[in-house]
């Protein structure tokens, strides 16, 4: 009897000290995507803005978004207008890391700008002043010019 009590005690001790794995935990894909986008943004921080460009040597806003998302294995059209015209429409309140955000910044049909939403109300974009910058989506400048978002 003493031997059985000892074995039962050992079993309870071992099971009580066993490793518990939370099977409901899944690392956030968006967190990983955001980290990757930050690395990409850093690589493009000195890229001059040149209309029609698509490389780190020179690019425009949609060339940057196309190249950045391609590094995440997401294929999108080349121009701001075609990027806005495709993808799935997303409301501002439902933005997720990697969504494209669009702005009316100039005159005419091509006076648009595009960036990539990060999180916490921030997005990255290739600035016309040169280099990729992270800025607040709800700053007075960008908030007044916001026209929509797309998810790919």
Feature annotation, model-predicted:
Residues 1-5:
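Positively charged n-region of N-terminal signal peptides that target proteins for export
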Residues 11-36:
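Bacterial Sec signal peptide processing site at the extreme N-terminus
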Residues 24-28, 48-56, 104:
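Second-shell loop/turn segments in exported
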Residues 27-29, 74-133, 139:
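...with weaker cross-activation on analogous glycine-rich loops/strands in unrelated enzymes
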Residues 41-58, 76-78:
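Active-site nucleophile-His-acid catalytic modules used for acyl/amide transfer and hydrolysis
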Residues 56-69:
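Active-site nucleophilic cysteine motif
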Residues 138-152:
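Glycine- and charge-enriched low-complexity intrinsically disordered segments
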């Amino acid at each position: 009897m003493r031997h059985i009590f000892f074995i039962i005690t050992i079993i309870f001790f071992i099971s009580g000290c066993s490793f518990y794995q939370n099977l409901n935990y899944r690392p956030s894909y968006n967190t990983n995507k955001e980290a990757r986008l930050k690395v990409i943004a850093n690589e493009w921080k000195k890229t001059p803005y040149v209309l029609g460009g698509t490389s780190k040597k020179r690019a425009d806003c949609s060339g940057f978004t196309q190249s950045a998302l391609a590094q995440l294995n997401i294929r999108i059209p080349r121009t701001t207008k075609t990027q806005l015209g495709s993808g799935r429409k997303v409301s501002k309140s439902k933005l997720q890391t990697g969504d494209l955000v669009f702005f009316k910044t100039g005159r005419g049909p091509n006076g648009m700008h595009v960036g990539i939403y990060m999180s916490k109300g921030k997005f990255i974009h290739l600035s016309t002043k040169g280099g990729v910058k992270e800025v607040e989506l709800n700053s007075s400048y960008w908030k007044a010019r916001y026209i929509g978002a797309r998810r790919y």
